[in-house]
A protein has these predicted regions:
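Short helix-loop-beta junction
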Residues: 91-103
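Short, glycine-rich nucleotide/cofactor-binding loops
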Residues: 104-112
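Ferredoxin-type iron-sulfur electron-transfer modules and their immediate structural context
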Residues: 1-10, 14, 73-87, 105, ...
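Cofactor-cradling patches in redox/metallo enzymes
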Residues: 117-167, 172
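A contiguous, basic/glycine-rich beta-loop/short-helix subdomain that forms a polymer-engagement track
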Residues: 24, 47-70
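Flexible loop/turn segments at secondary-structure boundaries
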Residues: 18, 32, 39, 47-48, ...
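Iron-sulfur cluster-binding cysteine motifs and their immediate structural context
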Residues: 1-26, 31, 35-53, 226
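C-terminal structured domains
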Residues: 93-96, 113, 120
């Protein structure tokens, strides 16, 4: 019986193949985009450096420090160390730089983040999330976009507004800067303080519980898209 094939289907280089009850990842073909880890619903395949739990610990610290200092309307800007850092650097050199409430959050590949991270951004008290993807890697971002759409659907179902989260794949720093300065303000999300411990499903459950406890619309079920 064939199980979940999301990682196999989403891999842009076809580096993942079935191997009996498991899968096999060819390290010589793998491009390291992390889409497999991001789209995996259980954490059966993970991104090694950094591990998802460590990423969430850093996220919790970053958002918590900002809020403890009196910051409001926190926007987390997830970016990679190449396209994203270059874009932010250009904005600082030739533009106005990042708005004061935008917090850059560097990862190896933007496509490595999954539903556990996306939901935790808001569960820890951030108001907005933007994810920078290089235009040339747009084809690798299908898994990320699917997870973003799912997170937005859940946020909308709980009454938080789905427009709090977006993927940006523009190469023009001026366009990205203009977007960041024009972000609409939403109501502050009550900050959760759960520890990022356990596997991916546990982390998703913890984030959902925190969001549900303080949700404008505390429904018990949200119909998911097909």
């Amino acid at each position: 019986q064939i199980g979940c094939t999301r990682c196999i289907d989403i891999c842009p280089t076809s580096a993942i193949t079935p191997a009996g009850d498991h899968i096999d990842v060819d390290p010589y073909i793998c491009a390291g985009c992390g889409s497999c880890a991001g789209t995996c619903p259980t954490g059966a395949i993970t991104y090694s450096l950094p591990a998802g739990e460590l990423l969430l610990k850093r996220l919790r610290t970053v958002v918590g420090t900002y809020l403890d200092a009196g910051g409001i309307d926190a926007t987390i800007l997830v970016h990679d160390s190449e396209h994203g850092e270059d874009l932010i650097g250009m904005m600082a050199r030739v533009g106005d730089g990042l708005p004061a409430n935008v917090i850059p959050f560097s990862v190896n590949e933007t496509t490595q983040v999954g539903l556990d991270f996306l939901l935790s951004v808001f569960a820890y008290g951030a108001s907005q999330l933007r994810l920078l993807v290089a235009p040339q890697k747009r084809e690798e971002a299908d898994g990320l976009i699917t997870q973003v759409d799912l997170a937005a659907h859940v946020l909308e179902g709980l009454g938080y507004d789905e427009d709090r989260i977006k993927v940006l794949d523009d190469a023009d720093p001026s366009a990205v800067e203009e977007h960041l300065y024009a972000i609409d303000k939403f109501s502050q999300i009550v900050r959760g303080d759960f520890l990022p411990m356990g596997g991916k499903t546990t982390l998703i459950r913890s984030a959902l519980q925190s969001l549900h406890d303080n949700a404008p619309r505390q429904v018990n079920e949200i119909e998911l898209p097909a």
